[in-house]
């Protein structure tokens, strides 16, 4: 009976920020933009949370990894 009383919320589809801005590439040197897609522990946010499309999520992941490699972003946050 309790199951019938619960109402399901319809999840709103998140729009890819990079597709909406028509930005051509994601720059690994733009640390402020990349920090939005990293958790407080230093993990990269998944697609279902960030709302990015698959193409831009792959580019974002590569940019974050490049930025970490040259020490613009930390691997872990303390």
UniProtKB/Swiss-Prot annotation:
Entry-linked SUPFAM superfamilies: Ribosomal protein S18 (SSF46911)
The record's annotation in InterPro entries points to:
Ribosomal_bS18, Ribosomal_bS18_CS, Ribosomal_bS18_sf
Coiled-coil ranges from the UniProt annotation: none
Which Gene3D superfamilies does the record match to this protein?
Answer: Ribosomal protein S18
Q: Which first-to-last residue range defines the signal peptide?
A: none
- The superkingdom listed in its UniProt entry is Bacteria
What are the alphabetically sorted keywords of the record? Ribonucleoprotein, Ribosomal protein, RNA-binding, rRNA-binding
**One Pfam family of this chain:** Ribosomal_S18
GO biological process assignments: translation
Q: Name one GO cellular component term.
A: cytosolic small ribosomal subunit
Give the GO molecular function terms. Answer: small ribosomal subunit rRNA binding; structural constituent of ribosome
Q: What PANTHER family does the record tag this protein with?
A: 30S RIBOSOMAL PROTEIN S18, SMALL RIBOSOMAL SUBUNIT PROTEIN BS18M
Family assignment from sequence similarity: Belongs to the bacterial ribosomal protein bS18 family.
Listed under subunit, the entry gives: Part of the 30S ribosomal subunit. Forms a tight heterodimer with protein bS6.
Q: Which NCBIfam families match?
A: S18
Its biological purpose:
Binds as a heterodimer with protein bS6 to the central domain of the 16S rRNA, where it helps stabilize the platform of the 30S subunit.
Q: What is this protein called?
A: Small ribosomal subunit protein bS18
């Amino acid at each position: 009976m309790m199951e019938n009383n619960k109402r399901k919320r319809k999840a709103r589809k998140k729009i890819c920020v990079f597709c909406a801005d028509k930005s051509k590439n994601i720059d690994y040197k733009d640390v402020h933009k990349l920090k939005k897609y990293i958790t407080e522990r230093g993990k990269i946010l998944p697609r279902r949370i960030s709302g990015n499309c698959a193409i831009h999520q792959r580019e974002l992941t590569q940019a974050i990894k490049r930025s970490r490699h040259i020490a613009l972003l930390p691997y872990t946050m303390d």
